[in-house]
Amino acid sequence: VPDPEKSHDLDILFYNSAAGTADSGESVLHQVEQYFQMVWSDSHSKTWLESAPFFYRKSVLLETEALHMRHSTWREAHPELLSKQNTDYIEATVPLKAVTFIHNPINILAKEPLVWWQLQQLMEGAEERVYLQTPYAVCDQSMYDGLSRVAGRGVPFSVQINSMGVGDNFMASSDYYRNKARVLDTGAQVWEWYGDYSSHGKSLLIDQDLAA
């Protein structure tokens, strides 16, 4: 059972099946690495803290010890996952026809919402179903309008978010409390997660062959 005191994300492993060959450079993973380096080396990226503040130091040390213990336990339980010789990633993963990496601009201040625009175009092109998972529904008017257009196409459209009882982001949960009627007015079928922990996964399923 997940720790109820922590948020739980959705992580996906991508494996470059062409690694070590002449086609390795075509993998989308290189684009992800380039994006990371672009953000890391940007002139506006600065070190925030060299060490934990005094009033956080004890909790940071306790969490560090817990992570080390969890890692040691995991290594003992699954040694095969750390062995390059015995790990068959092709067997452990599912082949994909194509993978596209999209991201917003990294400039400071206001940014063009490129990621949302592209996701919205994909949703509006759905023919069978759209399932959107997000921790919180904090929208501006253009996003409300976009969700309404998706729902208005008549394709089953579901949105899964944290209920206000399990959401661990006070500001985001407060926004949903204030604007819940606006979210429902988009026409999407809204599912509120009432689990024992806060879900922080972000995913999008379109028809039977596209995920984001």
Residues covered by each model-derived region:
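Charged, low-complexity intrinsically disordered terminal segments
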Residues: V1-A212
